[in-house]
């Protein structure tokens, strides 16, 4: 048998698939069971959420990064099949990670909770899978729960998504029920990868990480051709050339292999020192015999939310730059640029996909790189049209131009789809109205679940909307959003002044109708949070030159009369005058320390009055 025939025979037994599911529908547990069933790991190595290798993932019980693993499975037809399972995140902020992993597959297992049914993010991920022409295998999980209704959910999969669910596997990943059926369905229904092992090499980089000893490790899916150690490769986007030092697969541990050929999912090292040379979504080809064109990569994702990250210890500015460079390597949705603030010194303006993404990056910097951060209030990108016809893009409230020169301001709107139980429809609609939302559509999925669609300004969703939605529905709602474009709004910039000085990091953009209430609440909040000084400190909220709210932090007072026992009033008056004069001088030169909580207070407006 020739090399080519061997490769083609092996290729016909490869199955690449990923698991898509809403958070908590049992995706990581199902992955654990599949690993056990195919004996990829011993019982001794087994631990919950095995593929979620980041501590943060295990703590929060969510998958953030995609992971891949190669498994061997002895099917009932007597053949040994090679499975590549690519694990995907389920949260709306990590849709990009999902689209990356789906591009490396031919099939997807759709896990739906037998008690909860289809959720908003399940839908979003299914549409991504359909865009990539994947074979979708529905699995109804958690059938051992007392509240499970597998038949209702099966009907829901057919009605809401339009998939034929008559052969959907009823399973319980926790109890290990139905796992074998799932594996057999993968063998029967997921197509083998198509491609020619002899053609010029085309391999898609779907992730990468930096290893101190081996340089950059690229995770690849080979689409055409073959790659082995010693071969010269070329990155199609950057044109850089390297010599491959090692190729291999994950089982889940990294194991070297002789070669990777069509359909294989594995890793490649080539002494690549510079993180920027392996862009996720780039195509690797052979330097001697390059492919005529690159593979269609990924959509470039634009950040939706911006905020400033500043090191508390300014000496760590360069460490923060390095941390962001390393995180950006395998999180291409993260963007950053240097910025300075009068209040906080040197830092970076970073762009994220959403609030969870922002929190996770922040936590990863603090944990993995040991840098304590101050973060400023998140903001979205506004389009500002000037009276002279010029258009300015503003992602930082302190860059907002002079209101006299502004013709109009447009802000991004999203179409938010919420799936909620019937009883909470009123509460959810009230929440959306309070967030300047506009009602679009409402559909009853079944007797007790409703899908509600609103158009809401992104700035309203950015902070705590998801938490408020969950608390208004006792945790039952699910939520997904997509950007629909920009619309004009009556927006103004509000400055916060301490002791007559503007604090640039506390500025924010607010809807004019809510400006007064919001200013009042923030001023009161800052009054509580900023420690008292030796002198009186006025806290003011201003729009342009107009002060809309004011409060005063009272001065701390030392009792200068303590050492006067009885005696002459003029002596006491002299001491009091001297104290008063000292306070006056101090007020002129004194600066006010602003604690981190004060920056977050600008955001947390949920416990008082209307919100902007």
Swiss-Prot record:
Tell me the enzyme class. Answer: hydrolase
Q: Does the keyword Transmembrane apply?
A: no
Which stretches are annotated as coiled coil? none
Q: Which domain of life is it from?
A: Bacteria
SUPFAM superfamilies linked to this entry: EF-G C-terminal domain-like, P-loop containing nucleoside triphosphate hydrolases, Translation proteins
Keywords, in A-Z order: Cell membrane, GTP-binding, Hydrolase, Membrane, Nucleotide-binding, Protein biosynthesis
Which biological process, per GO, is one annotated for this protein?
positive regulation of translation
What EC identifiers does the entry list? Answer: 3.6.5.n1
**NCBIfam families from the entry?**
lepA, small_GTP
Alphabetized SMART domains for the sequence? EFG_C
Spell out the subcellular localization from the entry: Cell membrane
Q: Name one GO molecular function term.
A: GTPase activity
> How does the record say this protein sits in the membrane?
Peripheral membrane protein
State what protein this is by name. Elongation factor 4
Could you tell me which species this protein originates from? Bacillus licheniformis (strain ATCC 14580 / DSM 13 / JCM 2505 / CCUG 7422 / NBRC 12200 / NCIMB 9375 / NCTC 10341 / NRRL NRS-1264 / Gibson 46)
Record-stated family: Belongs to the TRAFAC class translation factor GTPase superfamily. Classic translation factor GTPase family. LepA subfamily.
Which reaction is catalysed here? GTP + H2O = GDP + phosphate + H(+)
